[in-house]
Amino acid sequence: MDPSPFTRRDFLVRSAFLAGSSALLPGYRFNIGAARPRLSETIIGQGDHRYRVELGWGDLDRATTPVENCHEMVMDSRGRLLMVTDEPRNNVLIYDKGGELLASWTLGYNAAHGLTLSEEGDEEFLYLAHNGFSDTGRVVKTTLDGRVVQTLPHPAEIGVYEADDNYHPTETAIAPNGDIYVADGYGSHWILHFSAAGEFIRRFGGRGDADEQFQTPHGITVDYRDPAGPTLLVTSRAHNAFKRFTLDGQYLSTLFLPGAFVCRPVLRGDTLYAGVCWSRLRDLNQTPNSGFVTILDRSGRVISNPGGTAPEYRNGELQLMVQETPVFKHCHDVCVDDEENLYVCQWNADRSYPIKLHRVG
């Protein structure tokens, strides 16, 4: 059971609409007293993807709107930035691009981790993955204001897992037909494929070092960039890699990113972005506080590493990438806005709020 006063059915909405907001609902409150952000002189990244760091962009009053870890962020059709945290008082914070808090809500989860935005007709929904380290993992679909509309079945309840198999989901992806893929990144390392209605279809992957297996499938997304048809990109974090699969789970290829313990792949246009939680900075080991951001072009070539060493290829092979400028501790996700600025969420970073990177090149 979560060590919070909330249950699955509990729902609490808090928001902080500023002057000019269209509505104020009961229980909403203003956000007062947050320190104003400032631009740093630091510019990070290489080539056409260089960024100026904005310090304190999303800082809030810790007494009223605390965070534990800032796990992931998405941008909705209105340009709002929705971020998931594992602080049970504030599972989702909703910002504008200026760093002002617009709203917050919670399901009381103390291990909320993955956040995926899905457009379904004229509506948008969120898929939230709850690790469930202290109780049980679950994946729920919600409206943008936090109303649960669907809960996927636990794999042990439908005979997909044995009763003692670990289930700690980290991410979801939604196919063009509405099918749902769940990455059990902190559990048994399977990708679970469900229909839009929540009916189990198949699983693939599992823990191991074969091409079609994973070591921490932390993230997953549907890649629409190939005109031949969409595919799945799945993180294999301990392998420092993304692995590509067909939508029915057939392995296609591996994109090796030496030194980079990448989180989920994030696509905008032809470009792929990812937070790097750790790099192999010391003796080729996973090093604490060594994160950065990595950016790849459509061909899978790394073109910039904000906070990291410049990408280098020798005889067509990517060389070791590590942190160079200590702007970040552990980058857990990247959100890209409509001006191609970046918002970086961090895990294990002293309960810090997101960092904004303004694109300058």
Question: Residue ranges of each PLM-predicted region?
Answer:
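Surface-exposed loop and turn segments in beta-propeller and other repeat-based domains
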Residues: 55-64, 149-163, 167, 201-212, ...
